[in-house]
Swiss-Prot record:
Record protein name field: Uncharacterized protein R455
UniProt entry keywords in alphabetical sequence: Coiled coil, Glycoprotein, Membrane, Transmembrane, Transmembrane helix
Glycosylated position list: N41, N86, N157, N168, N182
Entry's localization field: Membrane
Length: 230
């Protein structure tokens, strides 16, 4: 529940920044332009500074966005994902047939742009990913290299010829990772239920504990972004 609220808050502020750069600044500049054409003589210092800085930010943002989108088209590729359909979250989706009352399972096919694996450990692309997050620009998913090493079984043999294969292995293991962890937690609960209460102090030391490292948290974030139910 806490993770869901945190993801919603993160998305909220992402769209706030996106609205500032893509909507608010352009509206301010448009209103000032209309005000000028209306015949008002606005020669004050504050007005001129506001006009200049608003125009400068818009030009800078537009230029950066065009450069980044061109870079994304070269350095990333589209990957198709099949997401499970969740009735409680998807009632606002318009369907051509009745999926809500059907007993069989349904899936939604989506596409995501993912940076090629060769850029995962590049400091430049890590900074680009953070810059896009700050500016509210939708960027391809950058899979951290430590996750690729853990889930893709990569050592030092990543090349342009085999990165597609490693991406497939990484995404497959990324999808299965949470299930394996949940199985471990369920096994722990079964051990606790079947154990004698008098011997809990001895058995607790034998129950496998799931320790969430920073890598595990990053894996959960990627799972939420790529495989979360629609």
């Amino acid at each position: 529940m806490y993770e869901l609220m945190e993801n919603k808050q993160r998305k909220f502020w992402f769209y706030v920044r996106k609205g500032i750069f893509q909507v608010l600044l352009q509206l301010v500049l448009a209103m000032m332009t209309v005000w000028d054409f209306a015949g008002q003589n606005n020669t004050g210092t504050s007005y001129n500074k506001l006009y200049f800085y608003t125009s400068f930010l818009l030009v800078l943002y537009t230029g950066l966005k065009q450069i980044l989108e061109y870079m994304f088209s070269i350095c990333s590729e589209e990957v198709v994902f099949k997401k499970q359909f969740n009735n409680s979250r998807s009632r606002d989706i318009l369907m051509s047939f009745d999926m809500l009352n059907s007993p069989s399972g349904h899936y939604i096919v989506t596409t995501k742009r993912i940076f090629k694996l060769r850029y995962s450990k590049s400091n430049l692309f890590i900074k680009i990913d953070k810059l896009c997050w700050f500016l509210g620009i939708d960027s391809p998913v950058l899979i951290p290299f430590n996750i690729i090493e853990k889930l893709g079984n990569i050592k030092d043999n990543l090349t342009t010829n085999n990165e597609d294969i490693y991406l497939n292995v990484t995404l497959t293991n990324l999808h299965k990772y949470q299930n394996d962890e949940n199985d471990t937690e369920e096994d722990s609960e079964d051990i606790e239920k079947n154990s004698d209460p008098k011997e809990n102090s001895d058995i607790d030391s034998l129950i496998p504990k799931v320790i969430e490292t920073e890598t595990d948290l990053n894996i959960k974030e990627l799972q939420s972004e790529l495989f979360r139910k629609v």
